[in-house]
């Protein structure tokens, strides 16, 4: 495989990106975004999308490109190797669907000034547990949709910024107008057995 040939140490990341929780969270987000855009958003085609902490882009990039009319994708991650693999995994969307894909190797909390210059319709962050609050993120488009998820897996040190409720997530992101909010139960395995937690999305 590409990973084995180029970066065998990234096989664990690849396996984690295919885990049920990540798949379910990504699918849930894309389904709700699709519904929201069809019902409320003035623009339904040629969408410009910014993904923060895009990692390998799996499964989010294929889900977006196969289910929405995406014209541009901006994928932002601090890990340069993940970006290189993402370029390989998703190049056919650029070649066959003519989606303009741009990768950014940035550390999000220190790059709001640059990120806010990007003109997009949709901003996605599926793992705000691992990020500092996004209140400073505005993008160039005041009408942009922001779709984010977080969880309450605090005891595992899963992330630096877990939340305990939807209200906490709204405050963390700095959103006033909420078009969708929801909670989904998920499970993971710890040293002392199976644990249940809440995944929040707005």
Residue spans for each PLM region:
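Conserved class I S-adenosyl-L-methionine
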Residues: 43-57
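Conserved SAM-binding motif I beta-strand of class I
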Residues: 71-78
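A short SAM/SAH-binding and catalytic strip from SAM-dependent methyltransferases
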Residues: 118-135, 152
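Conserved SAM-binding loop of SAM-dependent methyltransferases across substrates and taxa
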Residues: 56-70
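Local beta-strand N-terminus motif with an aromatic residue
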Residues: 46, 119-120, 143
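S-adenosyl-L-methionine
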Residues: 1-45, 81-122
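C-terminal substrate-binding/active-site "lid" region of AdoMet-derived donor-dependent transferases
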Residues: 132-201
């Amino acid at each position: 495989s590409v990973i084995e040939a180029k970066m065998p140490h990234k096989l664990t990341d690849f396996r984690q990106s295919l885990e049920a929780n990540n798949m379910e969270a990504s699918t849930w987000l894309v389904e709700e975004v699709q519904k929201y855009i069809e019902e409320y958003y003035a623009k339904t085609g040629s969408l410009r999308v910014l993904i923060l902490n895009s990692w390998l882009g799996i499964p989010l990039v294929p889900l977006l490109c196969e289910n929405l009319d995406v014209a541009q994708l901006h994928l932002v991650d601090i890990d340069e190797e993940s970006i290189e693999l993402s370029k390989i995994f998703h190049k056919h969307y650029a070649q066959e669907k003519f989606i303009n894909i741009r990768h950014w190797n940035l550390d999000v909390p220190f790059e709001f000034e640059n990120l806010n210059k990007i003109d997009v319709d949709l901003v996605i962050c599926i793992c705000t547990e691992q990020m500092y609050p996004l209140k400073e993120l505005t993008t160039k488009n005041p009408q942009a949709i922001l779709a984010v998820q977080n969880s309450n897996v605090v005891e595992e040190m899963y992330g630096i910024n877990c939340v305990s409720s939807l209200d906490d997530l709204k405050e963390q992101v700095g959103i006033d107008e909420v078009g969708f909010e929801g909670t989904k139960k998920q499970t993971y395995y710890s040293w002392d057995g199976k644990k249940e937690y809440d995944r929040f999305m707005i």
